[in-house]
């Protein structure tokens, strides 16, 4: 969880930090915790994060998950680049099933989220017997519910959506 003092000093000079995901994603929450006064830029893919990171800009990539192991896409993109790793952060991930404010868990027919989240919650989802739809990130899956306008679709993301009155946490700690 710690980064070296040398890295901290060097990081004062960065302009932007790129991350994969939408506002409200786990990656953004890591950035807010460790770098509260920097500019964050959303990316749809790990490849985009790596392409944007460089001397004046940093990128944040998830590289390992205690439930499903290595985040292979992150590693592959990092290895193919000439970037250096400057620090490591640990973030406890607690997924929740989230629907629109009037949704009921027994009516959910389709669940959308990042492929890693779908895999991490596979036991819970198997018991639900629902259609799974991978999308580019967890927070984005919940935000997309507003466009879908269906109470039969849910997303998997962090429990912090509980405070947003547009959504309802249908099940915590899945």
Regions found by a protein language model. Give the residues of each.
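Domain-level signature for soluble enzymes in the chorismate/prephenate branch of the shikimate pathway
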Residues: 2-174
